[in-house]
């Protein structure tokens, strides 16, 4: 198939960016979206032009780095996948595809389609962990019985890969689905309940400090989340915060 690509190009975080049109030809419907961009970049390099910078690593929907806003949707028109899992069969010959970086004040553009998402890392560092005594008397990890329902729900929350689609698709650039998932995966487990109060207060405080917007319960984040993280996690985070604040 032959396609027109409208891609955001920006030299660095301090430069102004613009949309630039490119043509790609003979693209196989079996290619992944990133493979299609690889083809574009090979052509640009062959002509002595600067290739389009984009983030990627695993290309298996695990790392969350390949975050792109494609035709007005985080990760593109398919559901339950990341950009690297999107295939060109979702598009038609002759289509025009608009490709942008994730847009949020807390995700400044580094170059082209790459944004700085270290705000998520700082939120995680604020409390997204369980402290373990490693003095030599550490208890075996499997010694504490956990109800299957709690384990399953915690695992559902833990599937969050921190890609930032929830922020990009939210009209308020809210990170509450991400933070809610990270709070929930520990709050549901007995190992995580010891530090539950400090965890939720510290993570929410860091989220606010990073400049993310507030949640107004639109629900777009859940729809476009590649892992289908439920809004239930936001409700659980709010309950945990209320308990920690009284």
Locate each region found by the language model:
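Eukaryote-biased recognition of intrinsically disordered, low-complexity regulatory segments
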Residues: 1-22
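Short strand-turn-strand beta-turns centered on an Asx-Gly dipeptide
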Residues: 8, 25, 70-72
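Short, contiguous acidic and Ser/Thr-rich linear segments
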Residues: 20-32
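Functionalized membrane-embedded alpha-helices
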Residues: 62, 68-70, 221
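Glycine-rich phosphate/adenylate-binding loop and adjacent beta-alpha elements
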Residues: 70-94, 99
């Amino acid at each position: 198939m032959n396609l027109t690509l409208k891609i955001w190009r920006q030299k660095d975080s301090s430069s102004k960016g613009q949309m630039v049109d490119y043509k790609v030809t003979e693209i196989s419907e079996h290619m992944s979206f990133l493979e299609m961009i690889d083809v574009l970049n090979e052509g640009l390099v062959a002509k002595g032009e600067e290739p389009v910078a984009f983030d990627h690593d695993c290309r298996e929907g695990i790392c969350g780095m390949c975050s792109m806003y494609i035709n007005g949707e985080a990760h593109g028109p398919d559901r339950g996948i990341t950009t690297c899992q999107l295939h060109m069969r979702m598009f038609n010959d002759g289509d025009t595809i608009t490709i942008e970086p994730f847009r949020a004040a807390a995700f400044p553009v580094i170059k082209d389609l790459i944004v700085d998402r270290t705000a998520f890392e700082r939120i995680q560092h604020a409390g997204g962990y369980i402290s373990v005594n490693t003095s030599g008397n550490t208890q075996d990890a499997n010694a504490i019985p956990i109800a299957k329902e709690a384990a399953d729900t915690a695992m559902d929350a833990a599937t969050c890969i921190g890609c930032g689609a929830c922020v990009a698709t939210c009209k308020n650039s809210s990170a509450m689905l991400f933070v809610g998932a990270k709070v929930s995966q520990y709050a549901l487990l007995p190992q995580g309940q010891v530090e539950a109060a400090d965890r939720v207060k510290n993570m929410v405080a860091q989220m606010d400090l990073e400049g993310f917007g507030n949640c107004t319960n639109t629900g777009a984040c859940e729809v476009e989340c590649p892992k289908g993280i439920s809004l239930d996690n936001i409700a659980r985070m709010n309950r945990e915060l209320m308990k920690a604040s009284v």
